[in-house]
UniProtKB/Swiss-Prot annotation:
Originating organism: Sulfurisphaera tokodaii (strain DSM 16993 / JCM 10545 / NBRC 100140 / 7)
Name by which UniProt lists this protein: Probable aminopeptidase 1
Binding site for Zn(2+): H270, H274, E293
Top EC category: hydrolase
GO cellular component: cytoplasm; extracellular space; membrane
List of catalytic residues: E271
Length: 786
């Protein structure tokens, strides 16, 4: 048994390297203590003031002594310049900064520690650096003192927190701040970029105000840093009081597109939710990772609904979170929301649409079931009860149950411990309605799993609710059923199949219900439950829609068909997109602008004549509306194949928002040589390491270079695997297997599946099986008769 109270850490940096001294206030009752330690040189260990024996093996520092009061460790470490995990070097413009990324298990690469979320402690940090360097950590600086040729920054002690939330940044940071009220909000960037952070500070202030009101608990630290990191594996990280971001996830200004502003706002809101839910109250173990991530996702959209009502964040939640999660959870190789994690190295595979999107969607479903205010009171009680401590999912359900006055834990247990979800088949006969449930899978496999489904539906205009906890139920009504719709406002995590299909049009649907209906029937097409004729009939019904979410969804579905078989589905995609352009061309509202941006981008890819016309605008690129810049760049790339011109443009830009547009454009060039050219740009870091998975995935959607890409990936897989895992962790490898290899399997299914089986290891087994499922599904759709 080990009880840890406090870490006192002193680090002396000399460029990338550092000497460390830490004193850990702790107590152990065994004859040895095991700490986590990776890549650190341990020089001396003292227990209660006396030198003791120790050894390092299997990512552990083993100290052969009982500890009654204090463990003192002298060690050295080095910021990694090949990886972007742990403590690492992030280069930019001929300079660099040192930064950290510890979630889930990388604090052990920084200091010897008990690197587990339940081992909370207070951290007191002091750092000695060269003059001219600035240092940022979780807490405010309490002193800066000269120390010879260097300067020592001393930080205030943190509240009790987990190791994965500790942060250290060293570099030439440029800062702007908002000190209008507590907490002080500071935005830190690399030189020359801070002015693009004003929008982020404004969003952060509004979101904090919203959360303080919702949670009835003030933000707990004196300050909050929002930090732009030039190389970053994740999108952002919720280090308590020192949140780190990719540039593209933090910076936006008046020149940015609507989608960029929305994305930045959503990421900031997500990470700020963690300051309460994840940082102040933390999961006990990684089994409950989903609770951290799903709640932050859920709350982010709630806050944006209040702050930016014009963006209709609930629609974005359904589009970006629920629909993505439903798709991933349709696989036989999905996993329950709550997954038992034995080996910490398994954790990274849990950062997926199930932990984020499905978990958040289940929270939305339960909120709809118990009511918004009851749900909020349950959350407030939970946060107060476990403040500065650790908790589990069952603790949250108990708090919500207390507020509700009835036990919901059984319903929640159904949804977090069982994989998948049901399709609800709706049959109407005269004055009766029958609901029938079975698990939905894209491979259409029989599965007898029964879920407790909070059904919401409307019969003849009257709202109804039902907890469907068996295979089927038949309801009788006073009058013949003339209209019905199921899954109101799309709060439920299930699909709805109407028998006959025409029932789906019997009621008036709102924009979210239309979105859900079309996505359901798209997936029924993929699963072979409905014909291509039925699907296209549905799409035709919405060909003139002004529902921006629906327009983007149909465009996405038709583009997927195009990527699977461009010759067969080209005209279907083109005709829909051409019609939609007329509707959104002069859109003034933000959602309309987003839809127009998506539609012209897609049309440029499928229609060469349209691309040629649109490409003429590229000469005026800097003066263009930011919402169409991406589409114009892609059109130019397709029409000219001007790799060098686009690369020069990429190098000339100072913002990642613009650089990413150029990357997307280059990946659409229809010249096979771009595969090797782009690979070299990533390997030599002209394109940031963090973009490697994105570059490969974007290339795989280009049918003109796909075969070349697949040959490159398969022929160099061991080298690519080592590179991606080194620079971005296992997540990057999962991304490459699940994205590009699926499209390789569209071209050559047998060869790709054989390759996947050959490279399959324990770490990537689930990703391999997921990819094989998609290959089977897409090849069935590829060969449908129109």
């Amino acid at each position: 048994m080990v009880n840890v109270e406090r870490y006192e850490i002193f680090l002396d940096f000399n460029e990338y390297s550092y000497e460390g001294m830490e004193k850990i206030k702790m107590k152990s009752d065994g004859e040895k203590v095991e700490l986590d330690s990776v890549g650190l040189e341990i020089k001396e260990v003292k227990a209660d003031g006396k030198q003791v024996k120790y050894e390092t093996k299997n990512e552990k520092l083993i100290v052969y002594s009982k500890v009654n009061e204090e463990l003192e460790i002298r060690f050295s470490g080095k910021a990694d310049n090949k990886s972007i995990l742990g403590i690492y070097v992030a280069p930019y413009d001929g300079n660099y900064l040192i930064t950290t990324q510890f979630e889930p298990i990388y604090a052990r690469k920084f200091i010897p520690c008990f690197d587990s979320p339940d081992m909370k402690a207070v951290f007191k940090l002091s750092v000695r650096v060269n003059r001219g360097q600035k240092v940022i950590s979780n807490m405010p600086i309490i002193s800066i003192r000269d120390d010879g040729e260097k300067i020592v920054y001393e930080f205030d002690e943190t509240p009790r927190m987990s190791t994965y939330l500790l942060y250290l940044g060293i570099g030439d940071f440029e800062e702007i701040s908002d000190e209008s009220k507590k907490p002080k909000i500071i935005l830190a960037t690399t030189p020359g970029k801070s002015k693009r952070g004003i929008f982020a500070i404004e969003v952060a202030r509004k979101v904090i105000d919203y959360y303080e009101k919702y949670f009835e608990i003030p933000y707990q630290l004196p300050k909050l840093h929002l930090i732009e990191i030039p190389e970053f594996a994740a999108g952002a990280m919720e280090n308590w009081g020192a949140i780190t971001f990719r540039e593209s996830a933090l910076l936006a200004d008046e020149s940015s597109s609507v989608s960029q502003k929305l994305s930045v706002s959503a990421v900031i809101a997500h990470e700020l939710a963690h300051q309460w839910f994840g940082d102040m109250v933390t999961l006990k173990w990684w089994d409950d990772l989903w609770l951290n991530e799903s709640f932050a996702t859920f709350m982010a959209y709630k806050s944006l609904k209040e702050i930016f009502p014009q963006w209709e964040s609930e629609g974005h939640f359904i589009y970006d979170e629920t629909l993505s999660a439903l798709t991933e959870d349709s696989l036989l190789n999905t996993h329950p929301i709550e997954t038992h994690v034995k080996d910490p190295h398994e954790i990274e595979e849990m950062f997926d649409n199930i932990s984020y999107g499905k978990g958040a969607s289940i929270l939305r479903m339960i909120e709809a079931y118990v009511g918004e205010e009851v749900f909020r009171r349950g959350v407030v009680n939970y946060l107060n009860k476990f403040k500065f401590s650790n908790a589990s999912g069952s603790d949250l359900w108990n708090s919500i149950s207390e507020a509700y006055g009835s036990d919901i834990s059984q319903i929640m247990a159904e949804w977090i411990t069982k994989p998948g979800y049901p399709v609800i088949t709706v049959n109407v006969e005269g004055d009766s309605v029958e609901f029938f449930q079975r698990r939905f899978t894209l491979l259409n496999v029989n599965d007898s799993t029964i879920y407790k489904v909070p059904l919401t539906f409307e019969v003849n205009g009257k709202r109804q609710t039902l907890l469907l906890d068996k295979e089927s139920v038949k309801l009788n009504f006073d009058n013949a059923v003339s209209s019905i719709k199921v899954n109101l406002n799309r709060t439920g995590f299930y699909r709805v199949l109407y028998k006959p299909f025409e029932l789906s049009f019997s009621s008036t649907l709102n924009s979210y219900e239309e979105l859900g209906l079309v996505n359901d029937y798209w997936n029924f097409l993929l699963a072979g439950l409905e014909s291509i004729k039925t699907y296209l009939t549905l799409i035709k019904r919405f060909s003139n829609t002004r529902n921006s979410f629906l327009s983007r969804e149909i465009a996405f579905e038709l583009m997927t068909l195009y990527y699977i078989n461009k010759d067969k589905y080209y005209s279907i995609a083109r005709d829909f997109l051409l019609n939609q352009i007329k509707i959104y061309r002069n859109a003034k509202d933000d959602l309309g602008k987003m839809a127009y941006s998506s539609i012209i981008r897609s049309l440029a890819i499928v229609d060469d004549d349209f691309a040629l016309g649109l490409s003429n605008l590229f000469q005026y690129y800097e003066q263009l509306d930011s919402n169409i810049k991406g589409a114009v760049a892609i059109a130019y790339a397709i029409s000219t194949s001007d790799f060098n011109g686009l690369l020069d443009k990429y190098k000339s830009f100072n913002s990642d928002e613009e650089k990413l547009r150029m990357i997307d454009a280059i990946t659409n060039i229809r010249d096979k040589s771009i595969v090797e050219k782009l690979a070299m740009l990533v390997f030599n870091r002209t394109i940031k390491y963090q973009e490697a998975p994105h570059v490969i995935n974007s290339l795989s959607n280009n049918p003109y270079v796909r075969e070349e890409l697949c040959n490159f990936l398969q022929g160099n897989f061991d080298m690519i695997k080592q590179f991606v895992v080194t620079v971005a962790g296992m997540w990057g490898l999962f991304y490459i297997i699940r994205g590009p290899m699926i499209m390789c399997g569209v071209n050559k299914p047998e060869e790709t599946i054989e390759f996947l089986d050959r490279i399959k290891t324990k770490e990537i087994a689930r990703s391999v099986e997921i990819t094989k499922e998609y290959i089977k599904v897409y090849n069935r759709v590829k060969n449908l008769d129109l």
